[in-house]
Amino acid sequence: QRQMCIRDRDTGGNCGSQASTMIIRGLALDEISPKDFTKAWWKEIRVALLCSIALCSVNFIRILIQYHDPQVALVVSGTLMLTICMAKSLGCILPILAKILKLDPAIMASPLITTITDAFSILVYFNFALWYLSDRLI
């Protein structure tokens, strides 16, 4: 199960990094401005939902086949979906926020987003697992 959690965090960091790269590029080329925040965020959320549905479906089936436990598969896949959506949102929000604060949006790139996403995914994973699997723990 440790391996499953690590994959979730890597996926979140990759999704957030991809989103921030596209937003930073758009800001640098003046294709995006801070007033376009909701449009950019909505686009990233739609991409996140498509990616997470595909990845969670495959992940759910893989865990079900490998571990024969639908509850664990649901917890891990649900965490993966939340992590991807949060990472894509952060990847969009943080560079635009930096631009509004007159900071270099590049400082909001991969390392910061990955760190926040890692912390969030661990928090969500354990809380979701405790909540969903609590009847099995007692």
Predicted segments with their positions:
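Interfacial transmembrane-helix starts/ends
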Residues: 37-49
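Conserved, well-folded catalytic cores of nucleic-acid-processing
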Residues: 14, 26-30, 52, 64, ...
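Short membrane-interface helical motifs at transmembrane helix boundaries
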Residues: 57-67
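Juxtamembrane boundary at the C-terminal end of a transmembrane helix
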Residues: 126-138
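Short, small-residue-biased leader/transition segments that mark boundaries at the very start
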Residues: 2-6
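Juxtamembrane helix-loop transition segments at the membrane interface in multi-pass membrane proteins
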Residues: 15-40, 90-113, 138
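Hydrophobic packing and interface segments
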Residues: 70-71
